[in-house]
Amino acid sequence: ILAKNTAVEHMIGGVPVTINIIDTPGHADFGGEVERVLRLADGCLLLVDAFDGPMPQTKFVLGKALELGLKPVVVVNKVDRPDARAQEVVHEVFDLLVELGAEDHALSFPVVYCSGREGWATRDINTKTTDMRAIFEAIVREVSPPEADPTKPLQALVTSLDYNEYVGRIGIGRVFAGVMKTGQQVTIIKRDGTTVSSKVQQILQFAGLKRVPVEQVSAGDLCALVGLTSVDIGDTVAAPENPVALPTVHVDEPTMTMLFKINDSPFCGQEGEFVTSRQIKERLERELEHNVAMRVAPGKTSDEFMVSGRGVLSLGILIETM
């Protein structure tokens, strides 16, 4: 349910090409995850089942991608199933794109057929291959590289947060312009326009499932930044001599609200370690640090909190994790 990203290197004509891959949740309840990380992307892979076709949640995520002008590469998975109907599914995807008002460049989408279980992908459904090369070739061919200028003043957008008990808060995002180096002084521009001075203590880049320390990143790179203690989702990390904010992350408003309060039944305090209103408040405040789609407001009394989210599933998972 959380967006994750990785990076792989693919050889094209003997030249290594770095491809950053961001996996987003499909359910509309976690739309906040989708909306904030789509700002990192230059294109999208629309993964559909060769039997089920586009699902209801496909419409939500695809609509958000089209709003940002991302061109889809359609990947039809599970074509090895005996009941697969790959060609019909491609037509259903086209109809969905038309319904969502996609532009002409999105309607002329390339199609890759694959079997994730057997580990192969192909442009021609009648030709079975032995690897997933066709997907990476489609990405390099169809998705334009980032339009980024490393000579301009630094601009980077933070779209998600991580936390490490040793280094504290870690801001994850993309450099849109300029170059950022380890030890560099930067200005953090908050969503409300205020600025905070800070220092980049460490820069991490993604390599497979690992994070690798690097000395610098330039325009177009995705990275994780250590040392920016006051950074939040949607903040711009900019050069101190020319701090210009990037458009912040827009997230749709919550659709339902639930009342959270301490257990005041006759069985209160008999189980559970964190049972006071102060502890509940601290936990909800911690959730707000990385969950941009959630809102918390005080209730009628000091031990009540009105928690708003996208749906029953997102609030239910919050309750389980608490």
Q: Which functions belong to the PLM regions below?
A:
Residues 1-322:
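Structural and coupling elements of P-loop NTPases
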